[in-house]
Design a protein with these regions (language model features):
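Catalytic core of pol beta-like nucleotidyltransferases
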Residues: 1-39, 47-54, 63-122
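Short beta-strand->loop micro-motif that forms the acidic, two-metal-ion catalytic signature
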Residues: 59-61
Length: 122
């Protein structure tokens, strides 16, 4: 969330470095709590470096397997400790492998810009 400088009335949005550090710390916590995690990372404006005031954080998780529907998977992820608003997309490993084979705009974008903060050797 925006931070106010002590000697200024101007709000300053968290930098890419600040957000990256927070994501890496959050990742370490998630990996400890969720052994099913295969990969965690982020994409979008913070990954590309073109973030600005109001930018949110786009997270991506790959888990071994899940019985939850795709639409409900993100509900149980606590994103409140991150310095900007965030959303997470959660894929099962088979879904992720299937996505990686496709030549869609989204798949190409993830391949080129995702910043992975955790990758389990599979």
């Amino acid at each position: 969330m925006p931070v106010r400088s002590l000697n200024s009335s101007v709000l300053k949005w968290p930098s890419r470095t600040t957000v990256d550090r927070a994501v890496r710390s959050w990742t370490a916590e998630q990996v400890q709590q969720r052994p099913e995690i295969v990969r965690l990372g982020y994409f979008g404006s913070y990954a590309r470096g073109d973030w600005g005031v109001g930018s949110d954080l786009d997270l991506i998780a790959v888990v071994n397997e899940t019985s939850e529907s795709f639409e409900r998977r993100s509900i149980n992820w606590d994103l409140n400790g991150l310095p900007v608003s965030a959303e997470i997309i959660v894929y099962s490993l088979p879904e992720w492998k299937d996505l990686a084979k496709k030549d869609t705009k989204f798949a190409r974008m993830l391949k080129s810009e995702a910043v992975w903060t955790f990758s389990k050797q599979t």
